Swiss-Prot record:
This is U-scoloptoxin(23)-Er2a. Expressed by the venom gland. It comes from the Eukaryota. GO terms for molecular function: toxin activity. Keywords: Disulfide bond, Secreted, Signal, Toxin. Belongs to the scoloptoxin-23 family.
Amino acid sequence: MSLIVVRTHSFILFWFSCCWRVCFIQWIRKYSIPMADMGRRDSASALLDASENKNHLWG
């Protein structure tokens, strides 16, 4: 009887940890990737501004 209880609890714990991990990864992707894209966009716009300034200085 105790073996059945242990297996059931370990099975429930396994599924809970899997679901938690999937939800956590999705949360990380949802909130960290837009920040990274924003950073990339900012650096790209900074490079564009720098090239425009260089073209403006050279004529």
